[in-house]
Every structure is written in structure tokens, then in C-alpha cells.
């Protein structure tokens, strides 16, 4: 029974309604700004990927840039329509991972998770290299140092995320609006020009247009289509984050998804029209987007605005992976598919291990590619389209099982999308296999295998520990504490005092070697021990070799099995130096003993730290 308490002179209507947190969630506009960074940023490298492939057929091949882009825009429309259905069917979010886990089984969901992991990692590498490419297009003198610039940008983003940042959707609105607005201004102005107003950016750079041009065949067009499909990355981001929207969540997320598709499609088509109109050719060291800005707006302040807006948006796009991948790794760790360390948070509410893992792998990719975006883009497309295909196939099964009103049309739409994305996956894998796509083909099953292996290991550990069952009642056993000593000191006294409080019986042990010098030290220790008389026996362990840990471990095994049930504890006294550098002065004898006892016995190991203050 609840009781309503009202202050004198107040009415229930005067009370402030409870804060449900809705005001902190995303609207369609803020959701578009926060979750479309990957998709919007892809216009910086998607059209260029098409142009680079078609350049193999010379100027005639570049004439097919617009038709290929229209085909990609058509696929974008199918994907947007498909993901609207994913949002409606899975309002709790999760995207391809949630769809696969529900309708395609655990192993397929792991494939989706692995593709998401690759997507996040490659997004960082591609975004960083594309951002640096925009920077070097504006400042050509930096081109030879692009790899170091990439690593520096990655280091900065990593440092910021390790410190912990509070993400706000409103903070993403300004850079997103500036970038999208500048692209549309570029397109709008360019459509009214019959010729480039400036070619200063491309002057002095070598063209990569093929001199021995090949014919424009179906294979070349398919290859260009598959490469350009990298522009579709990020289309699934809104479906992954439906719970972040305000009520009605599904409807707002669907509106944001449609807006994303419309804006991205218009930008891709508009840029392709300008590429054809200005007869642009790919040149080394200058991005296609930089050439378009130069041709439409001139080599002035507007050109630099677009370049810096591109750099900032791509940096933010890379940053989204640092927010998304550690969370995905946390979920996989909670499901026992990754080491549990990935589920831990640092003092700043940061999944530090996930952030560091992402940074290390991304840095390796940057070194592998030499800081070149076009080397990484084909790898990016494979992981993305594997996730697309899994989501579409899962949705077909969803509609077949649900069989609601109009289910056949919905299943047909998702099936058509699965066919298109599946074909794109095969084409880009086959065409780019020798150029690096083999890395994804090998890594994807290895990741899935690693997930399964970790899961089995945790299952065995859980079975051994009896997780989920009531354990036996605790009982007391006879306890013996063994203390390794090599000399008499205050540390020895502190160790024996601690040992006496831990066990029923305490024994000190010392290892003796056959060398005359060592025997002399042993006799001196035994005389001092007898004179001190601590009430604890000193046991001599003879060892013919110079091993320290093995004789102690052998003695522990002997006393543990020779008498009644005994809980053996090995208490290892060690000093804790006052300063960090003084650790170099230690002989590490305690670590050697602990390692041997841990590896060869079931004894409890206790390491007593004596602070040297």
C-alpha cells in the first residue's frame, strides 16, 4: 500500500514529475548527428575508392563513376528500408548481433560479433588515415610523414579515451552540420560551374590514371561497385542504438535512419556528378574530395574549411569506435566469450583494456597499410558487408516465423538486401584478396574460434568450481605455515610473527648448496638461529643444483602427503623498497619461490611485504 504525502498548501499537480531520463536521450536530429558520423565521414573515401578502380580503364572508365554510384545509392536505399524493419523488430537494439543471436544461433551471432569487432577496428584505421589524407592534401609538405601523423592522431584519441570523456550528442551536431553543410555547398556551387575554377591542389602531383587502359568490363564495374560500397559503413549504427532514443524509440530511430540514407545518398550522387563534370583524375597525395573542393570553390579559405571539417569529422568517427568496441567486448566477456578483464572498468568508468586493445590493433593496421586509406578500404568493406548479410538473412527468418501482415513483402525486401550484400562481399573479397583482403578472410574465423575456445575454457572452469551449485560446508583443517629464510633480520622476525598467527605449526626452511662458501653461511645461520631461539624449527633442505624453488616445492609436497590432512601455506617475506628504481636492487628470490610452489603444489602462497620507509 502506498501513501501519498502532500505538503500544506500544495496539490499533487504541483509536484515535479520524476525524472525518467528521457530528456537525456536522443531525438531524431541529435541521434542523426551522434550516430551517423561513420556514414557521413565515408564520403571522404567512398567516391575515391570508385575512381581508383575505374582509373584502370583510363578516362573512359571514369565516365562510369556516376552509374556505379547510382547502383550503390540503390543498395543504400534497400539497406535503409531493411534496417527500418530491423529497428521495428528489435527495439532493444543490437543490430546484426541481436538478429543473429535470436534467429540464426550462437555460432552465427559470433560471426556477426567478429565482423563488428573488425568493423570497429578498421573504422579507426580508415578514419585516421582518411583524416590525415585530408590534412596532407591541404598541406602537401606533410605527405611523407603521413604514417607518423596517423600514429600521433591515434595516440591522441587513445589518451583522451583513457582519461574518460562524457559523450554528448549535442557536441556532435556542430561538426556534423559544418561538414554536411560544406559538402552540400560544394555540390551546389559546383553544379553551376562548367569547368573547374582551380586545379592548384592537383598541380605537380602524378596522376594514377592508367596509360595502358583496359576495357570497361563487368568485372571492373563489379570491383568498382564493391570498393565504393565502403561508403555504406555506419548504416547499421542507428539500429544498434535504438534504446538511446526518446519514446517512441522505434519511430524516432526509423526517422533518423531514413534521414541518414537521404543525406548520404544525396552527397554521394552529388559528388559523383561533379567528378564526371570536372573530369577529375585520381592523383597521388591529393584526395578526390580535396580536388572537388578546389574545383568548385577555388583554392581559398573555403577549401581549407572543407579539409579541416573533414579531419575533425573523421577524428570523431574514429572516436565512436573507442566508445562502441569496449562495450561490445564487455558484452562478449559477460557471455564468457572473451577474458573477463574486458568487462572491468577503470576509476574513470573506462573499459581500459578494451581501449588499449583497440589502439594496439589499429596501430598495427596503420603500420601495415603505411598510412594509406586505399589499402584499408577493401578490408573495411568485407567486415561491414558480412554483418549486413547476416542481419538480412536473420530478418528473413524472423518474418517467416512471425508471419504477420505483409510478411512476404518484408521477407522479400530483406532477402533482396541479403543477396546484394552477399554478392558484394564475394566480389570485394575475390577482387582484393591478394591486396590484403586475405587478412579479413583469415581473421574472421580465427576470432570466432577464439570466442568459442574462451567460452569452453570458462565452462570447464565453472564446472570445476561448481558454479551454480551449493558448495560443501566449510571445515577446519590442521594448518602448517612454511617460511623460507636465508638470513636473520627484522624481516625474518616479522614473517615468523605473521606465520604464528596464521597456522597451528610454523617451520622455517633454508636451502643448502654443496659449495664451501654456502655451507659456511648455513652454519653461521644455524648458530645464530640457535642463539636467537624463536621457538620455530629451522629445516635444512639440501640441493645439489643451484635451484631455489624446486627443493622448497618438493618439501611442501612431502609434508602435505606424509601426515593427516594439512593445509600448507608458504609465507614468503619480501621487502617493499621506498622508491621505484630500488626494485632493481632486489634479487627476486621471492618471485622464484612463489613460481615454483604455485606450479608444482597446491599450497597457499602468502607474500609478506615489509615496507622500507
PLM-predicted stretches and their roles:
Residues 179-205, 272-279, 389-404, 453-462:
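Hydrophobic alpha-helical segments and their helix-loop junctions in multi-pass secondary transporters
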Residues 50-101, 107-115, 126-153, 261-269:
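Extracellular loop-to-transmembrane helix junctions
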Residues 106, 146-151, 244-267, 333-367, ...:
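Loop-to-transmembrane helix boundary motifs in multi-pass membrane proteins
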Residues 1-22, 460-613:
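Cytosolic C-terminal regulatory domains/tails of membrane transporters and channels
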Residues 177, 181-233, 431, 435, ...:
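Helix-loop-helix junctions that connect adjacent transmembrane segments
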Residues 32, 341-352, 388-433, 468-471:
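C-terminal membrane-solvent junction of multi-pass transporters and transport-like membrane proteins
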Residues 154-192, 256-260, 377-390, 409-420, ...:
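Membrane-interface loop-to-helix entry segments
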Residues 190-198, 254-290:
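Extracellular/periplasmic helix-exit of transmembrane alpha-helices
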Amino acid at each position: 500500500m502506498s501513501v501519498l504525502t502532500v505538503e500544506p498548501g500544495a496539490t499533487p499537480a504541483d509536484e515535479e514529475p520524476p525524472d525518467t531520463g528521457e530528456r537525456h536521450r536522443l531525438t531524431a536530429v541529435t541521434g542523426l548527428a551522434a550516430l551517423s558520423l561513420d556514414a557521413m565521414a565515408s564520403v571522404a573515401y567512398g567516391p575515391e575508392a570508385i575512381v581508383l578502380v575505374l582509373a584502370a580503364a583510363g578516362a573512359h572508365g571514369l565516365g562510369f563513376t556516376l552509374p556505379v554510384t547510382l547502383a550503390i545509392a540503390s543498395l543504400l536505399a534497400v539497406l535503409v528500408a531493411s534496417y527500418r524493419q530491423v529497428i521495428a523488430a528489435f527495439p532493444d537494439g543490437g543490430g546484426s548481433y541481436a538478429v543473429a543471436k535470436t534467429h540464426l544461433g550462437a555460432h552465427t551471432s559470433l560471426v556477426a560479433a567478429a565482423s563488428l569487432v573488425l568493423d570497429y577496428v578498421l573504422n579507426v584505421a580508415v578514419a585516421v588515415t582518411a583524416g590525415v589524407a585530408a590534412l596532407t592534401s591541404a598541406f602537401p609538405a606533410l605527405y611523407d610523414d603521413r604514417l607518423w601523423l596517423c600514429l600521433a592522431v591515434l595516440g591522441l584519441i587513445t589518451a583522451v579515451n583513457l582519461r574518460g570523456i562524457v559523450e554528448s550528442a549535442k557536441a556532435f551536431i556542430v561538426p556534423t552540420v559544418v561538414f554536411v553543410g560544406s559538402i552540400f555547398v560544394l555540390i551546389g556551387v559546383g553544379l553551376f560551374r562548367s569547368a573547374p575554377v582551380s586545379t592548384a591542389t592537383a598541380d605537380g602531383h602524378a596522376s594514377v590514371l592508367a596509360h595502358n587502359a583496359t576495357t570497361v568490363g563487368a568485372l571492373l564495374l563489379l570491383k568498382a561497385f564493391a570498393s565504393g560500397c565502403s561508403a555504406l559503413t555506419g548504416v547499421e549504427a542507428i539500429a544498434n542504438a535504438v534504446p538511446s532514443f526518446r519514446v517512441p524509440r522505434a519511430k524516432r530511430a526509423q526517422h533518423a535512419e531514413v534521414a541518414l540514407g537521404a543525406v548520404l545518398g544525396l552527397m554521394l550522387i552529388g559528388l559523383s556528378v561533379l567528378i564526371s563534370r570536372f573530369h577529375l583524375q585520381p592523383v597521388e597525395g591529393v584526395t578526390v574530395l580535396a580536388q572537388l573542393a578546389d574545383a568548385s570553390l577555388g583554392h581559398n579559405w573555403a577549401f581549407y574549411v572543407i579539409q579541416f571539417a573533414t579531419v575533425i569529422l573523421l577524428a570523431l568517427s574514429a572516436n565512436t569506435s573507442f566508445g562502441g568496441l569496449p562495450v561490445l567486448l564487455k558484452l562478449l566477456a559477460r557471455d564468457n566469450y572473451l577474458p573477463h578483464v574486458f568487462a572491468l572498468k577503470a576509476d574513470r568508468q573506462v573499459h581500459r583494456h578494451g581501449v588499449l586493445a583497440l589502439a594496439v590493433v589499429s596501430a598495427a593496421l596503420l603500420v601495415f597499410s603505411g598510412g594509406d586509406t586505399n589499402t584499408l578500404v577493401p578490408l573495411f568493406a568485407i567486415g561491414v558487408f558480412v554483418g549486413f548479410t547476416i542481419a538480412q538473412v536473420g530478418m528473413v527468418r524472423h518474418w517467416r516465423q512471425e508471419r504477420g501482415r505483409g510478411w512476404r513483402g518484408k521477407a522479400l525486401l530483406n532477402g533482396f538486401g541479403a543477396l546484394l550484400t552477399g554478392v558484394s562481399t564475394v566480389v570485394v573479397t575475390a577482387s582484393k584478396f591478394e591486396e590484403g583482403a586475405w587478412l579479413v578472410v583469415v581473421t574472421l574465423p580465427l576470432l570466432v574460434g577464439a570466442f568459442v575456445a574462451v567460452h569452453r575454457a570458462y565452462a570447464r572452469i565453472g564446472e570445476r568450481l561448481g558454479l551454480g551449485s551449493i558448495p560443501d560446508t566449510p571445515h577446519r583443517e590442521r594448518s602448517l605455515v612454511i617460511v623460507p629464510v636465508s638470513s636473520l633480520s627484522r624481516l625474518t622476525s616479522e614473517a615468523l610473527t605473521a606465520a604464528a598467527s596464521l597456522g597451528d605449526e610454523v617451520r622455517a626452511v633454508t636451502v643448502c648448496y654443496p659449495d664451501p662458501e654456502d655451507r659456511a653461511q648455513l652454519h653461521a645461520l644455524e648458530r645464530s638461529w640457535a642463539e636467537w631461539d624463536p621457538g620455530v624449527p629451522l629445516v635444512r633442505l639440501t640441493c645439489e643444483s643451484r635451484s631455489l624453488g624446486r627443493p622448497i616445492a618438493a618439501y611442501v609436497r612431502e609434508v602435505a602427503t606424509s601426515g593427516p590432512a594439512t593445509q600448507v601455506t608458504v609465507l614468503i617475506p619480501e621487502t617493499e623498497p621506498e622508491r621505484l628504481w630500488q626494485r632493481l636492487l632486489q634479487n627476486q628470490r621471492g618471485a622464484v619461490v612463489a613460481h615454483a610452489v604455485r606450479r608444482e603444489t597446491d599450497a597457499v602462497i602468502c607474500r609478506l611485504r615489509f615496507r622500507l620507509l
